Regions:
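Glycine- and aromatic-enriched membrane alpha-helices
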Residues: 1-412
Length: 412
């Protein structure tokens, strides 16, 4: 074992932990005042339940053995046998450190889904959905890509830090939930505004900070690959931020803090699958292109298709993750990271690109089917959506009996 690597991974795990509270601020600032507490509480409860599930069954199902390349096994249930010595996934850090790092991924991923259901989903229905979704969608997908003998890893599909496992699955599942729940009441008549711009930027800043642990830590050692991932993360986020601002200038005539915050987040999403595979110049391209892809993707989803993906979980994470997976297939280099078996399409090889496309289709299929199964099970026990009066009053009061702004008595 290496003490420096161990300290680095534990620190990165703490960085990734910060991302979930950051997401709570990011989402909380975007919703209406009557729903901010509920929106943030959705992230807070996941911080608790995801840790318990990970220790009891999640780590074992994701990384404990292999069954048909789809799911792990039972040998690490309850962290039984997860020791302070190195495990099968990293030679220089304890198995416990690797498990702690991956636990934070299992925390942030389901929290991303909540952006699609803001303002209209019963809290108890969401709790049950997230528990089932982690079991049916996230743990199998994590195993397929990162676990020993995982199906997608075997065919050569790569995902350095979760741009596909985390963002495609959560974004697509959010879209399925949004379609199932239907639009917020008055969605077609009203104009929804961000209620707290500083919250949005604070959340984006915490996400960017935590993302360094997310991507650099996925090197699983304090080495050159970690430094490379750190820099590609910085470059893509910066390029996407500037790109989004330029789009706003040309389309709206002005830049916005919310737009810049959104741009940097989708830049982080886009580089995540390829942070440890693509060269620095490709990170610039990845960030520059993800903003128009997501910007016009959101316009299509909300403007043309009239789908109420409330906080653009699919528009930003789903679409951004898909682009990131494709970009990895275009620009990946074996000389940067030998985990990639082949070079990307721009270097004259096709196999990595094909493997990435297959992987993306699998992520989407598993997320759609898995989410529909979860929804069907939840409906056995409780309706998904709050009643009309509860939605009008706001979910802060109707679901939690508290108000983020005690002096506020309106319906906005």
């Amino acid at each position: 074992m290496n003490a420096g690597d161990t300290a680095f991974i534990l620190l990165c795990a703490a960085f990734v932990f910060i991302m979930t509270p950051g997401l709570a601020f990011f989402y909380g600032g975007m919703v209406r005042r009557k729903n901010v507490g509920n929106t943030m509480m959705q992230c807070v409860f996941i911080m608790g339940v995801s840790v318990i599930m990970w220790v009891l069954v999640g780590y074992a199902l994701s990384f404990g053995g292999n069954h048909a390349g789809i799911i792990g096994g039972a040998k690490w249930f309850g962290f039984n046998g997860v020791e302070m010595k190195p495990g099968p996934y990293a030679d220089t850090i304890p198995n416990l450190a690797f498990a702690a790092f991956q636990m934070m991924f299992a925390m942030i991923t389901p929290a991303l889904i909540t952006g699609s259901v803001a303002g209209r989903m019963k809290f108890k229905a969401l709790v049950l959905f997230i528990i089932l979704w982690s079991l049916i969608v996230y743990y199998p997908m994590a195993h397929m890509v990162w676990g020993e003998g995982g199906f997608l890893a075997e065919i050569g599909s790569v995902d350095f830090a979760g741009g596909n496992v985390v963002h495609i699955t959560s974004g697509v599942s959010g879209l399925v939930l949004a379609l199932t729940l239907g639009k917020r009441r008055g969605y077609d008549q009203g104009v929804y505004h961000v209620h707290n711009t500083p919250f949005v930027f604070l959340g984006a800043a915490l996400l960017w900070f935590g993302w360094y642990g997310f991507n650099a830590g996925s090197a699983l050692a304090a080495n050159g690959l970690a430094a490379h991932a750190f820099m590609t993360t910085s470059v893509s986020a910066a390029a996407a931020l500037v790109s989004w601002m330029l789009i706003e200038v040309f389309s709206e005539g002005k830049t916005t803090l919310v737009g810049a915050s959104t741009g940097l987040v989708i830049g982080l999403v886009a580089i995540t699958p390829g942070a440890g595979f693509v060269p620095m110049w490709a990170a610039v391209i990845c960030g520059l292109l993800v903003s128009p892809i997501c910007y016009f993707g959101v316009k299509l989803i909300k403007g043309k298709l009239k789908i109420d993906d409330a906080l653009d979980a699919f528009g930003c994470h789903g679409i951004g993750g898909i682009w990131g997976g494709i970009a990895t297939g275009l620009f990946g280099m074996t000389s940067i990271n030998g985990v990639a078996k082949w070079n990307g399409l721009v270097f004259g090889e096709t196999r990595l690109f094909v493997a990435q496309i297959i992987g993306i289709l699998v992520y989407i299929a598993v997320a759609v089917v898995g989410s529909l199964i979860c929804i069907a099970i939840v409906r056995i026990f409780t309706p998904l959506r709050v009643e009309e009066r509860a939605e009008k009053v706001g979910l802060d009061v109707s679901e939690h009996g508290e108000n983020a702004y005690p002096s506020f008595n309106g319906l906005d």
